[in-house]
Amino acid sequence: MRKALKVIGGLLLVSSTALVQAAAEGDSGNTLRLYNWTDYIGETTLADFEKATGIKVVYDTFDGYETVQTKLLTGRSGYDLVMLNASLVPPLIQAGVFQALDKQQLPSWHNLDEQVVSNLQGYDPGLKYSAPYTWGSSGVTYNVDKIKARMPDAPIGSLAMLFDPAIVSRFADCGVTLMDAPTEVIPLALQYLGKDPRSAAPADLKAAEQLLLGIRPYIRKFDSVNYLTSLPNGDVCLALTWSGDYATAQARAVEAKKAIKLAFFIPKEGSLIWFDNLYIPKDAPHASNAHRFIEFLLQPQTMAKVTNFIHYANSNAAATALVQADIRQDPAIYPDAQTRERLFAQKTQTPKDMRAITRVWSTVKTGF
């Protein structure tokens, strides 16, 4: 879930303009056009796939799912595979923007985690369109030393770290960020208030708005991407992040030889569990190649390498034993059964409710 473009496995991540230009110029059909977050793939996955199949991958990146939705709904996206959060998919399925998976071309489908498959039924019954990729939770990443220096008795493990003005104000000077994602932050605010985190009722949204406005003076930035740099650099000490990102941020601190110790917790009050999947657009020019790539990802050794690089739990049960022990045993990435009981799935909101949520978020970000 990254913004900066970079080279992965010798393959260039290109801009949308370059993608459109390439599509206009045509290709031999020996191509796969993939739309994904930056750094949300194994370090050598694309190169390994090209070596194994001879199919060249054009990897285009985005920094928000809203962009993906817009491209799909306008048609002629030019992509063969796109990454999406499962909660966003039901209205897109209804709009007919995807083509169904041909399971005959996916003989390794049985490798998928049965619990993940079960969790996804509410978004896409029978997983007619969804190819499971990764899953995770939302939580709090913090700089251990900076938090301890400012508040030795800080309520580590609680959403009060972010949502109690008397507490979060203690950390404002060392940098506090929230995701720029209303469907992540507002449910957590509601959960902290003891309300239904999936609610979009006007009274509940108003309560969440008031809570968030109360801590707004202490939030340095709304950011879903750059904390991967600001946390390991020491520019931010407390951030709402996705689960795997804390491990990536810590690894970057180690690589930069910075004496920064980061930690992560899934709030005791509960948090979101999310699922990212791959989808084939209705107008995909190389649907057969898309199926070949999905089948490649269904190989345990392939997905284990992906998790080892991006630090997110994958949806391939057969790959778990091949994941590095330090990642596989990290409770932030692979939470135990008791912790998973505290996690709740995201709700697919109606367009009307999403407009209300967006209005609340705009008010919170501007501070009035």
Where are these regions (language model features)?
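Periplasmic-binding protein-like
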Residues: 205-214, 220, 258-279
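Short beta-strand->loop
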Residues: 99-110, 160, 256-272, 281-284
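A bilobed periplasmic-binding-protein/Venus flytrap-type ligand-binding module shared by bacterial periplasmic
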Residues: 141-146, 191-192, 274-286, 305
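Early extracytoplasmic/lumenal segment of secretory-pathway proteins
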Residues: 23-92
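A ligand-binding cleft/hinge motif common to bilobed small-molecule-binding domains
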Residues: 88-91, 238-259
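Extracytoplasmic ligand-binding site segments that recognize negatively charged/polar headgroups
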Residues: 83-85, 89-218, 225-232
